Design a protein with these regions (language model features):
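PRPP-dependent phosphoribosyltransferase catalytic core
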Residues: 223-285
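Core catalytic lobe of class I
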Residues: 1-223, 272-285
Length: 285
């Protein structure tokens, strides 16, 4: 990181070790005392802030326990935008505490506002059995944006990477859908993306396939290199995701609604079509 020029990065995404006492082949100590972990985090965060352009976006993915304290540190140097809660679906028994059901994604910017901010829109949530809306939009149906509903700060549609078709390593890895959403929101084709904890290369491959320039850091690069040499599966997944965003209804939902007599003519429906083509073009750049 010290070798990179200051003010060169448009978007920085960091998924650091969570300090959970895990064993890594690199022999990194993942069981630091709390203050030691926070001091280490502040050192890399300060260096990362140096790299950001004015208006650049800074994302940190971590446990709420750590992001609560790191957020306070970041707020003294950057402008807070969002705390995004990312739902996790594991249901492990925990005694004496509420069940922790989300990861935290901190979003800060360098300066008063981001230079790039165009979040994806999402389809209306529908019943998978009948196609009916899960929420009542009342008399506002004809006023809704045909490209979908606004993205909120609770993301419950980010799946864990379990399917072997997409999973690239035995250890945990981030969903490509998460990075697709982050990069779409805070970068453009040609933007410079940096990830200081590359892992299996999810940020790298997302940036590559979405037409961003990128650089990253990782001690053990074998998984990321193998993934970048064969991006067919990741490209297929991104193309699938492109058909499911920036539309008011997914095609399958529209078909199910028609089959079960649900009216869609009150909405300004834009399902796939030209929007689908635009998204595919973006992925293939």
């Amino acid at each position: 990181m010290p070798s990179l020029p200051a003010g060169s990065v448009d978007l920085l995404f960091a998924d650091p070790p969570f300090n959970l006492g895990k064993s890594y082949s690199s022999k990194i100590n993942d069981a630091l005392e709390d203050q030691e972990y926070l001091d280490w985090s502040k050192r890399w965060i300060n260096e990362a802030i140096r790299l950001l352009k004015p208006g650049g976006s800074f994302f940190v993915y971590n446990l709420p326990k750590w992001n609560l304290r790191l957020g306070d540190f970041l707020a003294s140097r950057l402008t807070f935008r969002h705390w995004v809660a990312i739902n996790m679906t594991y249901r492990l028994p925990i005694q004496g505490r509420l069940y922790p059901s989300h990861y935290s994604l901190l979003y800060f910017v360098k300066g008063p506002k981001p230079s790039i901010f165009h979040p994806d829109r999402l389809p209306i949530e529908t019943c998978r059995h009948c196609g009916g809306e899960k929420h009542d939009y009342g008399g506002y149906k004809n006023k809704m944006n045909p490209r979908g509903v606004n993205l909120a700060d609770v993301w419950d549609d980010i799946p864990p990477v379990r399917h072997q078709k997409y999973k690239r390593r035995k250890a945990n890895e981030l969903s490509l859908k998460l990075l697709d959403r982050v990069l779409a929101m805070a970068s453009d084709p040609g933007s410079f993306v940096f990830d200081p904890f590359g892992g299996s290369g999810t940020t790298f491959v997302a940036a590559q396939l979405l037409g961003r320039r990128w650089i990253g850091v990782e001690l053990h690069c074998a998984d990321a290199i193998a993934r970048l040499r064969d991006t067919a599966g990741d490209l297929e997944y991104l193309e699938k995701l492109a058909l499911e965003k920036n539309v008011l209804f997914k095609s399958a939902a529209l078909q199910l609604r028609h089959k079960n007599g649900h009216r869609s003519d009150r909405y300004q429906v834009q399902a796939n079509g030209n929007e689908q083509t635009r998204q595919k073009t973006l992925v293939l750049q």
